[in-house]
């Protein structure tokens, strides 16, 4: 009887327990893919470091050899290749060399002879590219005779004083051209007339029977009656000019020099394709005498390249023969082709 009473009570209690369990809220699980937030410090914005382009100071004579540099400037090519260029006008080669020696110019158009003289004790300058090189029909240096002299051939210059700037590329080219024409060393006579205006005036008056001039001044003299006796268009190995930089500048800023030369390369292509487009620069930069504006034919400019070791050694032998140098100056250390585009 007692057992029969307990079973109904047990069943009632069990039913109440199950009901209460069913009504309890279920536990919430954190999904495995839900990120757990953590405290982070606020981000600090950073600014990109802007490096200013290197500025190269170029000493420039008023000569046609510099024309590609002005084309590069006019076309914005120096900026395109990440370099600033400042032109420093000079009136003479000695002034140019003084600025380079003092570190007031970084580079210039010059000749291998000038680099040799800088480098006779220690390497200070390196030629990195041809600037202008004679080609067929486009001479760089001209041996001219006065119209009053009657001289028309190299043979006529035997024993005749020829006005030059002594100890320079002009004297070097003069001797090499006449030697190539068959004259011997004792038949070649030069006289120092260092200033080009004086040389031109003496030629015109007949006081000087012969003299050597670079183009376009040679073209002007011919227009005034001078006679072309010889020029270096058939001997480009003698009369070329180069672009040179101080070695300290090259060592410190090789990428800037590479950018400069890349700009010159593109400017050269533009100039050779359409020289007439840049006629304004001939007058603006005083590269051509006023009487020749509109008449002077701009020569083709060389593509990337540097003087050969044979060209270097020939000029070196000449300089040593003149007593300008007493030591061999290293070609490998003085001519640098690694920066060309």
Say what each PLM segment does.
Residues 2-10:
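Bacterial N-terminal signal peptides that target proteins for export
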Residues 23-33:
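Bacterial lipoprotein signal-peptidase II cleavage site
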Residues 34-184, 190-193, 209-215, 228-231, ...:
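Short, glycine-/small- and polar/acidic-enriched structural segments
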Residues 80, 134-136, 302-309, 331:
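Short, solvent-exposed loop/beta-turn-alpha elements that line the ligand-binding surface or hinge
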Residues 113, 122, 190-191, 195-281:
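Pocket-lining segment of extracytoplasmic ligand-binding domains
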Residues 251-326:
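Secondary-structure end/capping motifs
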Residues 317-341:
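Conserved C-terminal helix/tail region of periplasmic/extracytoplasmic solute-binding proteins
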């Amino acid at each position: 009887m007692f057992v029969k009473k307990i079973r109904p009570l047990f069943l009632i209690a069990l039913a109440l327990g199950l009901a209460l369990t069913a009504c309890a809220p279920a536990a919430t699980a954190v999904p495995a893919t839900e990120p757990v937030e953590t405290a982070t410090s606020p981000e600090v914005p950073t600014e990109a470091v802007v490096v200013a382009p290197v500025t190269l100071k170029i000493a420039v004579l008023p000569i046609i050899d510099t024309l590609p540099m002005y084309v590069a400037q006019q076309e914005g090519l120096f900026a395109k290749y990440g370099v600033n260029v400042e032109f420093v006008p000079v009136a003479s080669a000695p002034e140019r060399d003084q600025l380079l020696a003092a570190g007031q110019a970084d580079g210039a158009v010059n000749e291998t002879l000038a680099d040799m003289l800088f480098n006779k004790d220690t390497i200070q300058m390196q030629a990195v590219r041809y600037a202008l090189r004679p080609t067929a029909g486009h001479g760089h240096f001209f041996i001219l005779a006065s119209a009053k002299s009657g001289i028309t051939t190299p043979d006529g210059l035997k024993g005749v004083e020829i006005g030059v700037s002594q100890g320079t590329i002009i004297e070097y080219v003069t001797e090499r051209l006449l030697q190539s024409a068959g004259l011997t060393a004792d038949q070649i006579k030069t006289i120092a007339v260092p200033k080009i205006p004086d040389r031109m005036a003496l030629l015109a008056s007949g006081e000087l029977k012969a003299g050597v001039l670079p183009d376009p001044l040679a073209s002007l003299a011919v227009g005034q009656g001078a006679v072309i006796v010889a020029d270096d268009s058939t001997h480009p190995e003698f009369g070329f000019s180069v672009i040179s930089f101080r070695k300290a500048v090259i060592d410190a800023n090789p990428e800037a020099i590479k950018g400069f030369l890349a700009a010159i390369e593109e400017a050269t292509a533009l100039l050779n394709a359409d020289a007439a487009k840049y006629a304004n620069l001939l007058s603006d930069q005083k590269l051509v005498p006023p009487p020749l504006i509109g008449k002077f034919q701009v020569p083709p400019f060389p593509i990337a390249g540097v003087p050969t070791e044979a060209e270097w050694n020939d000029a070196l032998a000449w300089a040593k023969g003149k007593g300008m140098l007493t030591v061999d100056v290293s070609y490998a250390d003085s001519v640098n082709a690694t920066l060309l585009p």
